[in-house]
Every structure is written in structure tokens, then in C-alpha cells.
Amino acid sequence: VLGTIGPRMNSVLDPSISPDCSKVAVRGRQDPGDVDHLWILEGMSANRITTNEGYERHMIWSPDGSRIAYSIQNDGGVSNLYIRASDGSGRDQVLIESEGMHKWYPSWSPDASTVVFHTNNPDTQARDLWYVSVASGETAVLVDDEGIQALARTSRDGRFVAYQSDQDGQMEIYVTTFPRSESRWKVSTNGGTWPKWSDDKLFYWEGNSLMGVRFATDGGFSPDEPQRIFTGEQAGMGASNMMASYNPEYDVNADGTRFIVVQRLER
């Protein structure tokens, strides 16, 4: 562990490293009675850049660092997607807003023209992958298999999307082509959750271990064997099985040399 960022808060989840690595966007609360909101951590300070009352979560920086996509839960209990200037100025841009199904966990394309996300049906708990045009709001389905497809992340070159799915009986990490799911590859070998890309590796959690997978993209997607990077216990995240949660507790920078993790501290 090289250091810490931001003050101690009651709860912090969903960390997202800014493209220049100077800041971290998080879903956090200062006090036990608060709801989760979007905060920007820089140095040892924390700045809330929104004024919404509903739960805010699943923050991610745009490729140029000027905007942040995130979800807000409305009064009816449904989560929709919005875009906010990362300096807190102006108002939220509606990315996709409708009743019925949650829209969670956005992921920008490298040119910031589209955002991939997963839907959640509150009645069936089914989750599918969609994407939306930032300019027009037009949506399309990417993956809608049986069961759960969730926590998608677009690769740094925009050609692939990694996600987790229970199509084989337990959560595993898969990669599909983007913007059309024409081919798919299984990456994990013993379960997986929370996929994240660097330029030349795909990372995910297997139980309490962070795994890294090198890959080649000539003629498709060809992953190497997963290698253990470190454990949650080694990084101060505790001994929990990370696969039991839909709330990512880490992020990685573009060159894959630095990670931000959420440490669990005694109260």
C-alpha cells in the first residue's frame, strides 16, 4: 500500500480513477444516517459535486475527465443514468430515464459517444447489457442471455466489453465484441467478478484474489491464463469473498501499475 486518498468517511464504494490519476470519484457517505452520493476525492479532501436527494452510485469518468456518468435512484425506487460535469458546474444531463427497470453501472466508450450499462428487472432480478448514445439517447441491446449479465466495462480501445455472467452456473468473466456481440470468450477459470481493463490486461476478482489476464487482439480476443496479483487481505480490504457483492471496491489506472482499493477499517 503506497498511500491513501481522501478523508475517512462512514462508507466508500465504486471508486473510479480520473484519467490523469489525480482524483478519485466515489459513492460515499460521511455519516451513518446519510444516503450515498457522488464525491470527488483529491489529496486528503472530499468534495460532493451533486445536490440530488436520491441514492447515487456507479460513478465513472469520461475519457477526457470532463464528465462523470452515474446512476441516481428516483422517488419511485428506480435508478436511471445521468452525466455530470466533473467540476460540479451546471445541471445533470439525462442519459437514460424511464420507469420499470434499473439502469446501473455505466461504462464510456473511448470516444465518449456511447455508454454501456446493465439493466436490472426488480421482479425477476434478471440483468442484461445495453448501450446508449450520449448524443441522442437511443438505446440498443448488447447481451440479453438468460440469467445475469452485469458490471460491464468497455476496453480501452473500444473493441470489446468485459462483463460477469452466471450462464455457466456461477459468476464468471466473459468478453464480447462491441458494438455487436458477435463473438464471446470466457476469461476466468474459477469464478469472477468486477472486471476492469488496463491497456494490456483485464483484471477481476476471484474470491479474495485480484487476478490479471494478459490478452492479444489479433484476429479476435485471446486471453492468457489468469495470474494472481494480490489478495484483499494484503491490500487491507479484509478476507471477504468479493464475488458476493455487486459493489466494486477497486479500480486500476490505464497502464495497470496502480490500483485504488477500499479498505475496511475498525469503527
Residue ranges and their predicted role:
Residues 108, 116, 127-134:
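Acidic, glycine-rich loop-and-beta core segments that form the ion-binding/anion-interacting portion
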Residues 41-45, 85-89, 133-137, 177-181, ...:
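Short loop/turn segments that connect beta-strands within beta-propeller blades
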Residues 2-3, 45-48, 89-93, 137-141, ...:
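Predominantly a core beta-strand signature of beta-propeller blades
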Residues 7-27, 51-73, 93, 97-119, ...:
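Conserved beta-propeller blade repeats
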Residues 201-266:
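C-terminal structured "cap/appendage" subdomains that terminate the fold
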Residues 30-32, 75, 121-123, 234-236, ...:
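Active-site/binding-pocket entry motifs
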